[in-house]
A protein has these predicted regions:
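Bacterial Sec signal peptide processing site at the extreme N-terminus
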Residues: 22-44
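Register position in tetratricopeptide repeats
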Residues: 54-55, 88-89, 122-123, 155-159, ...
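Terminal, low-structured helical/coil segments at or just beyond the last alpha-helical repeat
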Residues: 33, 39, 197, 201-245
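Structural marker of alpha-solenoid helical repeat scaffolds
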Residues: 37, 71, 105, 139-142, ...
Length: 245
């Protein structure tokens, strides 16, 4: 398996890595008056959309977000969820349009700025995304936790092969329990990139048992195990199998 295959751009779209995305904003912004009943309908639709997105069902999430927008066409949160669903479906242009709508409706909400940066990263504008993540971290205030942005910055930096930046960012994210599993996976991936197999094993072992059985983690573990096997078979090449123990 090639190193590029170890860390694909889509791997974090799986439900266990939804931590990379800001699903909820600090508030539910809207620019037009809505009745209490309508607000409840929108909230219910978006709760459903979020749940479907977390379960890896972006098509259904997109439908629910669209239904929310039928009730309130100026809901920034609905445009945000719509954009994330479109991102998961790899409909990049449509996702950008929806995210731009969310930002236009709530320009001061750092959650949406975070997601704009992630969309840039996933669509190939990696350097621009890194700058955008930095801007979000610099602007972080009391109601916005920068640990999530450090996590996404680290993942994006891996895409740019900015490994030192990636490691610094992921180490800042790993201290937050909510993002520790995804950050440890990112750090393990970094260690595989640098062929530091013992460290990669340690980071994978730091993940919770439920996360360690995900397809992405098992795939990375298999890659590491293959290195164990090669070292056992060819110690004369300078490899030391005991380094993994």
């Amino acid at each position: 398996m090639s190193r590029a295959a170890v860390f694909s751009r889509q791997c974090f779209w799986r439900p266990i890595f939804i931590a990379l995305l800001c699903l909820f904003a600090a508030a539910c912004q809207t620019t037009r008056p809505v009745t209490s009943a309508d607000a409840e309908r929108v909230d219910l639709r978006l709760q459903l959309a979020t749940a479907y997105l977390e379960r890896g069902q972006p098509n259904v999430a997109l439908t629910e977000a669209k239904r929310a927008l039928e009730v309130d066409p100026s809901s920034a949160r609905a445009f945000n969820i719509k954009a994330l669903a479109l991102m998961a479906l790899q409909r990049v242009d449509a996702a950008k349009q929806a995210m731009q709508a969310a930002v236009a409706l709530a320009p001061t909400d750092l959650s949406y700025q975070h997601n704009v940066a992630w969309l840039q990263c996933m669509s190939g504008d990696v350097e621009q995304a890194l700058q955008a993540f930095d801007a979000v971290i610099l602007r972080a205030v009391n109601d916005f936790n920068p640990a999530q942005t450090h996590l996404s910055l680290g993942v994006c930096a891996i895409q740019a092969k900015r490994f030192e930046l990636a490691e610094r960012a992921l180490r800042q994210a790993v201290v937050d329990a909510r993002y520790a599993n995804a950050a440890n996976f990112g750090l393990a991936t970094l260690m595989v990139q640098s062929e530091n197999w013992p460290a990669a094993v340690r980071y994978l072992a730091s993940m919770s048992p439920a996360y360690r059985v995900s397809p992405e983690v098992l795939n990375l573990q298999m890659h590491i195990d293959a290195q164990y096997d090669r070292m056992q078979q060819a110690p004369a090449d300078g490899m030391n199998p005991s380094a993994f123990n």
